[in-house]
Amino acid sequence: MASVNNYQVDCGSRSARIQPRINNGIHDEESLFEVLELSEEEFELDFHRLKSFNDVRVINNPDLSPECTNTAISRDETLESASSAFEVPSDEIAILSISSDSNKNSPPSEQPAPALRNIRSSSNSDRIDEWCLGSHLFNELHQNVPQSSDGVNHGFPVYSFKERELYTSAKLKKLTNAQRIAVQKLSRDLYPILRTCYREKTRRQLLTYHHERIFDDIPSFFPQRDFIFNYYSMPLEFDRLSDVDIDSSSRSRFTDESTGETLNRSPSAASSSLENTSWFGWTLLSRFLDREW
């Protein structure tokens, strides 16, 4: 079967056996299931088996082709496609393709593969997230991250880089110093992430401030998320977001830079600030924390 959109079909597969019948002429009234010579139920079961993905694979290295491969692609055409394409294993295709809400089982004569059982045990979003975060495609990106001996990579701490943040890191490396400062300022204005405050009166008629997350499903791979939330649980820090230094002492945190005098902030002053402020944020500033704060 000739290649279409950089795909090739293994010899002897079900898809390959369809082509001669198409060439011989198939009437329009024949349904897809008549062409495949199987019932609708069998087609559904076959689709949900991992083996069904062996019929079509993404072209990569010709040496990786399965045995008994017979295609109409020339060697030059294959090499050209192989230089710009990558191979996606069938289990990864299954993770992104098989619907988790299907309750159909494999035929009794054939036990489902372990990978398929794991796929069906979680939701679509969980499986897609797991694939995106654990795919082998990240390995090459991870190996290509330049690192210097002084522990700084283009102005950002090397240890703050995470494997799953390399896409954003590549974008940040292209920014000029002025652009980075602008991004940092914007990030601080939007920071911290997903936090809001509300007041609650206790029996002693004292105002108690609680912090709750707006969303509960924030991905855990955001760097320093727990530290961010714990840090911003200190109420007085909301008033002086741009002047706070995490590494400084408590006294220096509340010192006015213009007069050098210590600020005597009362709980009521902090309450007025918290009462009228809802804090939303963005995760981009996380990679600035170790250097700037």
UniProtKB/Swiss-Prot annotation:
Coiled-coil boundaries: none
Signal peptide range in chain numbering: none
Keywords: Autophagy, Peroxisome
Keyword field contains Lipid metabolism: no
Domain of life: Eukaryota
Subunit-level organization: Interacts with PEX3, ATG8 and ATG11.
Function: Required for autophagic breakdown of peroxisomes, called pexophagy, through linking peroxisomes to the autophagy apparatus. Involved in regulation of the glyoxylate cycle.
Region (Disordered): 98-121, 250-273
Upper lineage: Eukaryota, Fungi, Dikarya, Ascomycota, Saccharomycotina
Major place of residence: other
GO cellular component, one term: peroxisome
Single GO BP term: mitophagy
Localization in the cell: Peroxisome
Record-given protein name: Autophagy-related protein 36
Polar residues: compositionally biased ranges: 98-108, 260-273
